[in-house]
């Protein structure tokens, strides 16, 4: 899977804030409401501001988050797992929320990451229009590229509002995706250890 998000070409460059706000007004009219009524006067401005935050992952480079690693301390070479990382994303098909948790592990190969950076890389990819499958692969691929560990394991468990709020309307159902690389991919007992560590409370 090609998990790379390519930059916009000059022909599809980012519109201005004013254009974004006008687009919100158009959607409000299309939905059947009046963007000039009192309760909606500031809505286009608020939506544009919210989108800047919700999709802030487009403004962050992976290298800025994972570009600095540390030499291993004390010879530790077993699983490093950060579990239950909460995230909010939006599906690229309907632009509706995806709410879930990510569990990310790696096997060190001489270098380690600050633990907060694992959570930050989850947020980086979550704050973009996504499919859950792509996001899972992107997290793993970025750790492989910048940390070069012996293996990476990523599990994402999320509820998709496009299933809960529209269409089939099955609230409470979740989707589970996993990606394994290196020793986690070739060594089944390591996969089992990862799954057990994620599930144990």
Swiss-Prot record:
SUPFAM superfamilies associated with the record: Tetrahydrobiopterin biosynthesis enzymes-like
Top-level taxonomic group: Bacteria
Transmembrane stretches, start-end: none
Binding site for Zn(2+): 91, 94, 162
Protein keywords: GTP-binding, Hydrolase, Metal-binding, Nucleotide-binding, One-carbon metabolism, Zinc
Biological process annotations from GO: one-carbon metabolic process; tetrahydrobiopterin biosynthetic process; tetrahydrofolate biosynthetic process
Matches recorded under PROSITE patterns: GTP_CYCLOHYDROL_1_1
GO molecular function term, any single one: GTP cyclohydrolase I activity
Entry EC number(s): 3.5.4.16
Family: Belongs to the GTP cyclohydrolase I family.
Subunit structure: Homomer.
Name of this protein: GTP cyclohydrolase 1
């Amino acid at each position: 899977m090609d998990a790379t998000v390519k930059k916009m070409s000059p022909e599809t460059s980012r519109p201005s804030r004013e254009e974004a706000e006008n687009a919100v007004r158009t959607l409000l009219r299309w939905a059947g409401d009046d963007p000039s009524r009192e309760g909606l006067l500031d809505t286009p401005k608020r939506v544009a501001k919210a989108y800047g935050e919700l999709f802030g992952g487009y403004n962050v480079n992976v290298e800025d988050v994972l570009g600095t690693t540390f030499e291993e301390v004390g010879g530790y070479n077993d699983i490093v797992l950060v579990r239950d990382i909460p995230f909010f994303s939006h599906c690229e098909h309907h632009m509706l929320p995806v709410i879930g948790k990510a569990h990310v592990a790696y096997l060190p190969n001489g270098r380690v990451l600050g633990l907060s950076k694992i959570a930050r890389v989850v947020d980086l990819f979550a704050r973009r229009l996504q499919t859950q499958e792509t996001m899972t692969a992107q997290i793993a691929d970025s750790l492989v590229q910048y940390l070069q560990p012996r293996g990476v394991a990523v599990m994402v468990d999320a509820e998709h509002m496009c299933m809960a709020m529209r269409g089939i309307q099955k609230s409470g159902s979740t989707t589970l995706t996993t990606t394994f690389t290196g020793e986690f991919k070739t060594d089944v007992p390591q996969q089992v250890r990862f799954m057990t560590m994620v599930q144990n409370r």
